Design a protein with these regions (language model features):
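Extended C-terminal subregions enriched in glycine
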Residues: 456, 498-551
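Internal maturation/activation junctions in enzymes
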Residues: 302-408, 420-421, 436-437, 443-445, ...
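Active-site rim segments in enzyme catalytic domains, especially the processed small/beta chain
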Residues: 71-104, 254-256, 400-469, 499, ...
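Short, well-structured alpha-helical segments that form the helix of a local strand-helix-strand
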Residues: 59-66, 161-172, 242-246, 310-330, ...
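Active-site Gly/Thr loop motif
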Residues: 254-276, 354-384, 425-466
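Bacterial N-terminal signal peptides
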Residues: 9-22
Length: 585
């Protein structure tokens, strides 16, 4: 593994370092000849690298990484939640193969449309709500998704027990608590402290973990040991399943043993689009991210973005208008394709996408209220998930690649840990429409198409993505961030293609967000000049500071690029995550 600096072919990269504050200065990309794992957590990156060194492929390593994050990054890493895995198999065919593992959580059989509405007709708050406690969880999909991926698309050179081992070892022997983790556990103590098992495991019964302290999780280690011995179905039919179902029944939860046994992973076809000679491969529904991403690049294609200047008001204005139109369609038409008809082909039709910018003006913002849904009224009005998600990127020596984004939904999920298992549960039910017509936590009005139905997957913004050239991987990326996920991925890809930035600069660069409603642009603090803000306001753009809930930064995009000439891989962590690491060899 090398960290030799590379020459930058454009002056923009150097300029970026001058305008960005110190905490957003890009770290050197890690250069590797064979394989790379890039995550928000050093232990998880090393777990994936361990499997690569043992002969596993990118899928094997991704599974080990996701399981390890359960131990070392419980903020979002999980086996009690779900997500999406995008896989590229470099199997000798001219273009390889790309596929999606959809292991999103589903609503339990006992779930109902109005289950979170109180007698007063208002949404229930606190324990018993869609966000906190025993009734907030969908059926977890992570173990089933990881198992299917490893069994069907792994190398065959490492076993299921092998890929589980790094996580089991980290839980049994412990890992050193970072400053970030110690602070995070204190910040979320009010949630975790409501539940005895979580209070014991994550808060040391109120005495808290200090930075540098070794944190051992014996119950979680025992769960991983059962998964090693009995296989992944143990989580859904064995002792772990029984413990989950019994605890849920005891505390009035919704998940049953039958729910766990009947959970099914879905394999889906990827979405593909073109942008300036590159191919973008991304997520289909029930993620809204892929359609929105491809729409935005389709709208952007006719414009000479590079000529506008990297940090210019002209570029930000154009991006805001593109985002606004894509998010308008997202709000109207998208939901779980197993339950509603999503007009994917129409939304991605080149003529339709081009027509969305027919009323664009470089001098004036289009008011959000004046942006209609392009295909007429439908009203899916899908809500985004919370920002407490995590992403990781993996590539192996053969060119196989994984872009994986998964979540517990909110930070530390529902706050509930199942006694005897160490498994922290999701609060994914909050991603459904709990009350039609009521605004969600992001202020978006929620519609009927995303209403709770047993077996249904809630819509998501998660957008794991690849960029390919001539069938070969050029970029692997993705991000957490709720509705900002789509725009973060959009900007990282544009930074690489339009501005030729090396991956570390593309990831560290300032980010903006516009989601149609509310009709405003948000920027990361300190990263845009007052002159640029003034020019945008003169065009009629509304500028809003990020709220305390959102934090000062947007997203976390651990990414990998490949040099097609040398075959070298370059992995970049996001400077917005202090515990991040790129591990390669």
């Amino acid at each position: 593994m090398k960290t030799t600096p590379r020459p930058v072919g454009v002056l923009l990269a150097a300029a970026l370092l001058l305008v960005a504050p110190p905490f957003l200065c890009a770290q050197r990309a890690i250069e590797a000849e064979h394989g790379l794992v890039v995550t928000c957590n050093s232990y998880a990156s090393d777990a994936g690298l361990e499997i690569l060194r043992k002969g596993g492929n990118a899928v094997d390593a991704a599974v080990a990484t996701g399981l390890a994050l359960t131990v070392t990054y419980p903020f979002a890493g999980n086996i009690g939640g779900g997500g999406f895995m995008l896989i590229h198999l470099a199997d000798g065919s001219p273009d390889g193969r790309d596929l999606v593992i959809d292991y999103r959580e589903t609503a339990p059989a006992g779930a109902s449309k109005d289950m979170y509405v109180g007698p007063d007709g208002k949404l229930i708050q606190g324990p018993g709500s869609s966000t906190v406690g025993w009734k907030a969880s969908g059926i977890p999909g992570s173990v089933a998704g990881f198992a299917l991926a490893q069994q069907k698309y792994g190398s065959g050179k490492v076993t299921w027990a092998d890929v589980v081992e790094p996580a089991r070892r980290l839980a049994a022997e412990g890992h050193l608590v970072s400053q970030w983790t110690a602070a995070s556990l204190k910040q979320w103590a009010k949630l975790l402290g409501q539940f005895d098992e979580s209070k014991k495991i994550f808060l040391k019964n109120g005495s808290f973990y200090a930075a540098g302290e070794n944190w051992v999780q014996p119950d979680l280690a025992a769960t991983f040991a059962r998964l090693q011995k009995h296989g992944p179905r143990e989580f859904y039919e064995g002792e772990t399943a029984r413990l989950i179902a019994d605890a849920m029944a005891q505390h009035g939860g919704n998940l049953t043993l039958a729910d766990l046994k009947n959970y099914k992973v879905a394999e889906r076809a990827v979405l593909r689009g073109k942008y300036r000679g590159y191919e973008i491969v991304t997520m289909p529904p029930p993620s809204s991210g892929g359609i929105a991403l491809l729409q935005m690049f389709g709208m952007l294609e006719p414009f000479d973005v590079a000529a506008m200047g990297y940090n210019s008001a002209a570029k930000y204005h154009l991006f805001a208008e593109v985002m606004k139109r894509a998010f308008r369609d997202r709000a109207e038409y998208l939901g779980d394709p197993d339950f509603i008809k999503v007009p994917v082909a129409q939304l991605l039709d080149p003529a339709y996408v081009k027509g969305r910018m027919a009323d664009y003006s470089p001098d004036h913002a289009t008011p959000a209220a004046a942006v209609p849904p392009g295909l007429g009224k439908f009203v899916a009005a899908a809500p985004p998930e919370s920002k407490e998600t995590t992403h990781f990127s993996v590539i192996d020596a053969a060119g196989n690649a994984v872009s994986n984004t998964y979540t517990l939904n909110g930070a530390y999920g529902s706050g509930v840990t199942i006694p005897g298992t160490g498994v922290l549960m999701n609060n994914e039910m909050d991603d459904f429409t709990s009350l039609v017509g009521a605004p969600n936590m992001f202020g978006l009005i929620q519609g009927e198409a995303n209403a709770i139905v047993p077996g249904k997957r809630p819509l998501s913004s998660m957008t794991p993505s690849f960029v390919l050239r001539d069938g070969k991987i050029v970029l692997i990326t993705g991000s957490p961030g709720g509705p900002t996920i789509i725009n973060t991925v959009f900007q990282v890809i544009s930074n690489v293609i339009d501005f030729n930035l090396p991956v570390e600069q593309a990831v560290a660069a300032p980010r903006m967000h516009q989601q149609w409603m509310p009709d405003s642009i948000t920027f990361e603090r300190y990263n845009v000049s007052p002159d640029t803000i003034a020019l945008l306001k003169a065009k009629g753009q509304n500028i809003r500071e990020r709220t305390s809930y959102e934090g000062w930064s947007q997203g976390d995009a651990p990414s990998i690029t490949l040099d097609p000439k040398t075959g070298l891989r370059f992995g970049a962590t996001d400077p917005r995550r202090p515990d991040a690491k790129a591990s390669g060899y």
